[in-house]
Amino acid sequence: MENFNAPFRFDYVGSFLRPEHLKQARADFEAGQITKAELESIENEAITDLIKKQKAAGYPVITDGEFRRSYWHLDFMWGLEGIEHIELDHGYFFHGEETTHGSVRVTGKISGEQHPFVEHFKFVKQFEDEHTIARQTIPAPAQLLAELFREDNGTQTLAVYPDLEELIQDIAQAYRTVIRDLYDAGCRNIQFDDCTWGMFCDKNYWEARQKDFVSLEEEAAKYLRLNNLALENAPEDLVLTTHVCRGNYHSTWASSGGYEPIAPFLFANENVSAYYLEFDDERSGGFEPLRFVSDDKKVVLGLVTSKSLILEEKEVIKKRIAKAAKYIPLNRLYLSPQCGFASCEIGNKLTEEEQWAKLALVKEIAQEVWG
């Protein structure tokens, strides 16, 4: 495995469409109709089949497709000590659709011991071979901080943590614990998924936030510092990357806007080796902000949408790669879908066959561009 370094010329973000029988099994478990052991057996079988398909598609990365999760972010948060699962009276309001209502609440000191995702990773790790590496995706620490202050959640958060600095330090330490445990389990590739930066790009979001007397610079500095604290003392051979997301629920989106507002903060100063960036439509803006990416970092261009079954034209994607290469050398660019195919259990509006066709297209284009 020492010859593998993410990102790869053709890559993907992590989540895959759940098979219908897996969705049914999870519903049956919630209804008390099957046991936890029976659900885990069905999950294991579905993940094993997914990894076979990932390998057959020729991709060097294997994941569990986030098949054991309901949400891309909340399940990880619920696995931390001091955090509990709550249901709000409404979900996130995406473009034309409302999400389900799950959220988090602080109940005590936050820590990361014995996180269930470590065992989840071990199951994937066993399928690694000389051609593949197992990746673990987790929500960024900044995402947890944002969720803890989402609407009324902040009241409980401040009741438990009146000192914001103590909260930041505990979140960072919890993440360092999980990262070390994943590393000890054999993980060498961890991807932060982070919607906080996507929201910073959105003008409407920031106009709404002005009532809190919060500046973008202050919030960006706080989130960046937290993410970097969580990455302190990470092993040198652990590849750490960030996927910046604008929301991906049932083929809808949450935020719009180019990367210009966040680029000077994030692209130059986050202590990761690569960014997976959404560039699948006009909502993402142009490639000009890539000029802020520091010379030691790589960029995975999310030019192929995971929200639609329509296959992009190869030549259009190649021309867009060439445009991006005006700001970052081609040898530091890579290609992927813009996001996962099922950031939440409901999944996007395409079939499994259409999902694999998207990944085949990404691979074909990458091989034609980079050889």
Annotate each language-model stretch with its function.
Residues 1-371:
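Domain-level signal for soluble alpha/beta catalytic cores
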